[in-house]
């Protein structure tokens, strides 16, 4: 059983993550029968690391803790732990994270800045492995226009308007309230804001859009795996939106597929962060704007819409660095080390 709160709060989120750790513990222990060589734990959620370490001890396996998000840093950066870093919840969370990071054989993560953060948290540099999010590049190479048109018709999106697409989790760390504000400012232009996905913040955003009478904003459920290439190719501008303070703790996995399809993305990130540096190092790969600024977001959308719809800089970067087979081959070599 898994506890999924209808209206998330800090306590309810902790209960949600804890219930997942408890419910997965017994199936995890059953795996000791075949004595794995490596056990990989994925964060979120840190709550599962004690079970992973126990299984490793029972089976003699080596452990890898893979960090997708620094969930403690994200919690503190977004003010979800009460009194900030000095609060009791924050202190307990930080201690729990430290224990998890320091008691595994390797720590892997998805960006260079997140690798540096692991080292700052006391992990030995030789134990830290680069394991970026990948993309199945071939899936996004030849997306048929007919598939895009069919999906567009299925979703009821008009042909005469450009699509501003957000596809992914709809939670607190994204700061999607600014997308509502941007849609309101652009309501008289031939644009549709398509918000695709699920999450604890979706109902609130739908209510905000309804209260403001935003006919240029539509919400859709998460689309199927098979529909993803057509969905991403459909977008004239992709939104990769996060609040200030989250850009190095959380590197959006959605960006890899946007780059693979050659999409034009507007990324909210400070210049010094991993995402900000990506945009500076590879000019034209995306439009980087200040987080939590409606004015910057609107300007970024306008800029992205002036670009050719197929972004060759993004596409070529994805082919060089994000191909699934290459990423997995390197990771396997690293953990065999």
Indicate where each model-derived feature is located:
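A short helix/loop element that forms part of the nucleotide-sugar donor recognition site in Leloir-type
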Residues: 141-157, 312
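Membrane-proximal helix-turn-helix segments that form the acceptor-binding/catalytic region
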Residues: 29, 35, 47-50, 54-59, ...
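Carbohydrate-associated surface elements
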Residues: 113, 134
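Nucleotide-sugar-dependent
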Residues: 174, 221-259, 265-280
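Nucleotide-activated donor-binding/catalytic signature segment of Leloir-type glycosyltransferases, i.e.
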Residues: 190-197, 202-229
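Acceptor-binding helix/loop patch of EC 2.4 sugar-transfer enzymes
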Residues: 5-12, 34, 59-94, 138
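A charged, aromatic-enriched C-terminal amphipathic alpha-helix characteristic of glycosyltransferases
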Residues: 291-292, 296, 305-335
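Conserved donor-binding/catalytic core segment of Leloir-type glycosyltransferases
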Residues: 158-174, 180-183
């Amino acid at each position: 059983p898994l506890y999924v709160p209808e209206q998330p709060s800090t306590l309810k989120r902790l209960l949600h993550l804890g219930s997942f750790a408890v419910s997965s513990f017994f199936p995890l222990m059953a795996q000791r029968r075949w004595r794995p060589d490596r056990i990989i734990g994925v964060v979120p959620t840190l709550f599962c690391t004690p079970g992973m370490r126990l299984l490793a001890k029972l089976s003699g396996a080596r452990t890898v803790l893979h960090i997708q998000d620094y969930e403690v840093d994200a919690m503190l950066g977004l003010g979800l732990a009460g009194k900030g870093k000095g609060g009791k919840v924050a202190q307990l969370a930080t201690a729990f994270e430290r224990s998890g990071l320091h008691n595994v054989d390797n720590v892997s993560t998805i960006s260079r800045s997140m690798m540096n953060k692991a080292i700052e948290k006391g992990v030995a540099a030789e134990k830290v492995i680069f394991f970026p999010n990948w993309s199945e590049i071939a899936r996004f190479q030849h997306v048929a226009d007919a598939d895009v048109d069919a999906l567009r018709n299925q979703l009821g999106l008009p042909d005469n308007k450009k699509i501003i697409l957000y596809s992914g989790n709809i939670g607190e760390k994204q700061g999607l309230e600014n997308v509502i504000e941007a849609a309101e400012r652009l309501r008289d232009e031939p644009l549709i804001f398509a918000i695709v996905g699920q999450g604890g913040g979706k109902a609130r955003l739908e209510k905000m859009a309804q209260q403001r009478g935003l006919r240029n904003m539509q919400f859709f459920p998460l689309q199927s795996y098979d529909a993803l290439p057509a969905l991403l190719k459909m977008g004239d501008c992709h939104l990769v939106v996060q609040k200030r303070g989250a850009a190095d703790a959380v590197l959006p996995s959605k960006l890899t597929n946007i780059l693979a399809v050659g999409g034009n993305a507007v990324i909210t990130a400070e210049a010094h962060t991993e995402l900000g540096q990506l945009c500076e190092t590879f000019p034209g790969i995306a439009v980087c704007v200040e987080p939590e600024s409606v004015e910057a977001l609107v300007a970024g959308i306008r800029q992205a819409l002036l670009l050719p719809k197929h972004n060759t800089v993004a596409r070529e970067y994805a082919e060089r660095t994000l191909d699934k087979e290459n990423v997995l081959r390197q990771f396997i070599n690293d953990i065999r080390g």
